[in-house]
Amino acid sequence: MSAQKSAGIQLLLDAEREATKIVQKAREYRTKRVREARDEAKKEIEAYKAQKEAEFKKFEAEHTQGNQAAQEEANAEAEARIREIKEAGNKNREQVIKDLLHAVFTPSPEAMAAH
């Protein structure tokens, strides 16, 4: 009976070893699949990111041109307005200076109001 028990125990030990090998292979396979899935996800994320960056650059380029044209137009209008103001200032400059000097240096006999 001892030989039968020994053979039965040996059979159980062999089955346990075989089961351990199967479980270990399953774990290794699962770990490998997780790594592959992670790598695949990274690649998809990078591709999606590159696509969105390209779309953003295209959008930015299209809208920057419009903004640039508006900026140039605004600059031209500002320059024209500055020229007008300078011309108006130069036109009446002498008279304004005379009026200011006259007002500052000519005393007027008016009483000051008390506060």
From Swiss-Prot:
Pfam family, one: V-ATPase_G
This protein's record includes keyword Membrane: yes
Taxonomic superkingdom: Eukaryota
Subcellular localization, as worded in the UniProt entry: Vacuole membrane
UniProt gene name: vma-10
Protein name according to UniProt: V-type proton ATPase subunit G
Primary location group: membrane
Entry GO CC: vacuolar proton-transporting V-type ATPase, V1 domain
Keyword Ion transport: yes
Record InterPro entries: V-ATPase_G
GO molecular function: ATP hydrolysis activity; proton-transporting ATPase activity, rotational mechanism
Topology class, membrane: Peripheral membrane protein
Protein role: Subunit of the V1 complex of vacuolar(H+)-ATPase (V-ATPase), a multisubunit enzyme composed of a peripheral complex (V1) that hydrolyzes ATP and a membrane integral complex (V0) that translocates protons. V-ATPase is responsible for acidifying and maintaining the pH of intracellular compartments.
Keywords: Hydrogen ion transport, Ion transport, Membrane, Transport, Vacuole
Assembly notes: V-ATPase is a heteromultimeric enzyme composed of a peripheral catalytic V1 complex (components A to H) attached to an integral membrane V0 proton pore complex (components: a, c, c', c'', d, e, f and VOA1).
Family membership noted in the UniProt record: Belongs to the V-ATPase G subunit family.
